[in-house]
Structures are given as C-alpha cells and as structure tokens.
Regions:
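STAS-typified acidic loop motif
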Residues: 2-33
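Short, solvent-exposed coil/turn elements at secondary-structure transition points
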Residues: 11, 19, 82, 104-106
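General small-molecule cofactor/ligand-binding pocket signal
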Residues: 6, 79, 101
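Amphipathic alpha-helical interaction surfaces in cytosolic regulatory modules
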Residues: 26-98
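Charged, low-complexity, helix/coiled-coil-prone segments
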Residues: 1-13, 45-58, 107
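Non-catalytic signal-transmission and effector/linker regions of two-component phosphorelay proteins
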Residues: 1-5, 121-132
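A charged, well-structured terminal subsegment
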Residues: 102-127
C-alpha cells in the first residue's frame, strides 16, 4: 500500500495514494497505525481524499482501527471522504460510528479538542472557584 505520511506535533496524517482500498491494504494500514500508537504522538488523521472506492472488509477494519485508537486514549479522525466511499460506510452502518470530518483542517480541530478533553479528564484535581 502506498501512503503519504505527514507527522505534525500533535498528530500524524496518513493519506493513501491508491484510488481503492482493499482488505489487504487496510490490514497493512492497521500495522502502520499500530506502530504510531507506540509513539509519543499517537493521534492519526486518515485523509481519504484520493480514495474513490473501498471494499466492505476494508471499511470494517478501519472502523475497528478507530476503536483501537480510542481504547488507547488516542484520536483517529477520517477526513475528505468521497460520496462513493461514504455510501459504502453508510451501507455497512459504520458512518455514524466513525469520527468523520469534511476537511483535514476540521480533523485537526477535532484532534486538538480531544487532546484538551483528555488533559482535563486526566487531571483528577479539577477545582472550581465558587467564591462570589
């Protein structure tokens, strides 16, 4: 599977180069993402802009991959999906389960908001000032 990888401070963007994602390609993507989960910066944005078709099994693997990231306290956001890919996800009843944004910029925002949320939830000593 040919992909472009762009690592930023808070996340890594993965963009497949091929126009169709097959099951074996999604399995390879899972292996790549498993490696990212071991790094300090473990949030992923999957940019599907070049992808015009996806096999059912590949879509299911990507949904499982997203859950693996959230179970590991990391973000996994999919962006720029084309209508044909969206139809496959909808048919498999996965679209509502996935964290999908129209643009990569919005995906960045989601990752940053989830990072802030995790920081707040991890800080068990949250104090509220009730002085009036």
């Amino acid at each position: 599977m040919q992909i472009k990888v762009d690592t930023k401070e808070k996340f890594t963007t993965i963009t497949p180069v091929e126009p169709k994602i097959y099951v074996n390609m999604a399995a390879e993507l899972t292996g790549i993402c498993d490696g990212i989960l071991l790094k300090e910066t473990k949030n992923v944005i999957l940019n599907l802009q070049p992808v015009s078709d996806i096999e059912d099994g590949a879509a299911e693997l990507i949904a499982k991959l997203q859950q693996k990231f959230y179970d590991a306290n990391a973000s996994f956001v999919i962006c720029e999906i084309k209508p044909a890919v969206e139809e496959v996800l909808e048919k498999l009843e996965l679209l509502e389960l996935l964290n999908v944004t129209p643009t990569e910029s919005e995906a960045w925002d989601i990752v940053q908001m989830e990072e802030i949320e995790r920081e707040l939830l991890d800080d068990g000593d949250v104090e509220f000032n009730t002085n009036e």
